[in-house]
């Protein structure tokens, strides 16, 4: 995880949170993500030892399969478990003690995959149901997770695929996300369709690196699954709805349809209506940069992408759908 949130302060943070004007005061800004809980020493020692064991297994698999044609695309599927646990401990991002168990399970799954990869096998690529995958980002070389829901009916024929952008979650560390994607189907599960859940660099509404991450996750998934390019749907709710709006207007040619839910589509209106901000006092460069992701600026592109927006009738974020 660990994105540099400083660059988002003037733009994303206030737009995603509902804290209002008081959150513009430096002394009032909450740390994001919040500090984690105190992990018992015994658990920390066990997890640290598990990390060392997994790191060794990853190195052995890498050496044994150095000439494997798919090594570069399969290795992140193993490394993602090491990174998730390592960063959770390193950056104090275990936010509840139940995540200690999730860390143990992540290390076990990582070790299982490493041992299989050492033998040149990758059984998770044939797995149905919930599948945790990962790829190496072209932006910074980091391993980034994403989740898949593979229907039982999938046999390798071209299939509809829905991309679901997740909502706000300040404690959604990479460990929490990997655990979630291994255990929860999620908000949507269309019949006979694959669902792809991008992590999108934590809680930034798939902006900046999070934007490219969703596209890279799709690119990686296409290497292993017969995704029908004519049946890819862009979806999301709340903060994920905001992401769906931007993807719909900026990449209208990639989707057969878009389905944003309760997500802001333009910054000034959202800040004023949802957070009671006085946007008239914003600097010229803030207002200029808002247009980077203001979906209304490129709404004409929706002629190429059928779009159905939805929201609760008393939700202030209904403004975007209206």
Listing of model-derived features with the role each one plays in the protein:
Residues 306-315:
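Conserved strand-to-loop "acid loop" that flanks and positions the catalytic carboxylate
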Residues 234-236, 259-261, 310:
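Short beta-strand immediately N-terminal to the catalytic nucleophile in serine-hydrolase-like folds
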Residues 153-157, 206-239, 249-255, 276, ...:
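Gly/Ser-rich "nucleophile elbow"/oxyanion-hole loop immediately N-terminal to the catalytic nucleophile
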Residues 20-78:
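Amphipathic, heptad-repeat alpha-helical segments
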Residues 243-247, 259:
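Hydrolases whose catalytic domains are alpha/beta-hydrolase-1, hotdog thioesterase
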Residues 169-181, 253-300, 304-305, 319:
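Mobile cap/lid helix-loop segments that gate and shape the active-site cleft of serine hydrolases
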Residues 156-225:
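Active-site machinery of serine-nucleophile hydrolases
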Residues 20-37, 91-159:
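A domain-start/cap signature at the N-terminus of enzymes
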């Amino acid at each position: 995880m660990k994105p540099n949130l400083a660059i988002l302060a003037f733009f994303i943070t206030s737009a995603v949170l509902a804290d209002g004007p008081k959150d513009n005061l430096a002394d009032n800004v909450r740390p994001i993500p919040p500090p984690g809980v105190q992990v018992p020493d015994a658990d920390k020692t066990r997890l640290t030892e598990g990390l060392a064991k997994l790191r060794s297994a990853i190195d052995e698999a890498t050496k044994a399969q150095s000439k494997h044609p798919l090594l570069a695309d399969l290795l992140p599927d193993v490394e993602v478990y090491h990174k998730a646990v390592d960063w959770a401990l390193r950056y104090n991002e275990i936010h509840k003690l139940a995540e200690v168990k999730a860390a143990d399970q992540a290390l076990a799954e990582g070790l299982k995959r490493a041992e299989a990869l050492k033998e040149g096998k990758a059984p998770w690529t044939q797995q149905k149901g919930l599948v945790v995958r990962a790829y190496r980002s072209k932006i910074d070389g980091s391993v980034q997770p994403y989740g898949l829901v593979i229907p039982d009916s999938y046999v390798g024929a071209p299939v509809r695929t829905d991309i679901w952008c997740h909502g706000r979650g300040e404690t959604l560390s990479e460990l929490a996300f990997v655990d979630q994607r291994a255990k929860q189907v999620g908000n949507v599960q269309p019949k006979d369709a694959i669902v792809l859940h991008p992590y999108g660099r934590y809680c930034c509404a798939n902006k900046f690196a999070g934007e490219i991450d969703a596209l890279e996750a799709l690119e990686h998934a296409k290497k292993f699954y017969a995704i029908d390019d004519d049946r890819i749907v862009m979806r999301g709710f709340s903060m994920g709805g905001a992401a769906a709006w931007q993807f719909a207007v900026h990449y209208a040619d990639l989707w057969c349809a878009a389905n944003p839910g309760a997500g802001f589509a333009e910054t000034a209106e959202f800040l004023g209506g949802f957070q009671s901000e006085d946007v008239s006092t914003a600097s010229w460069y803030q207002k200029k940069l808002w247009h980077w992701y203001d979906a209304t600026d490129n709404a004409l592109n929706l002629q190429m992408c059928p779009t159905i927006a939805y929201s609760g009738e008393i939700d202030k974020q209904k403004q975007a759908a209206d």
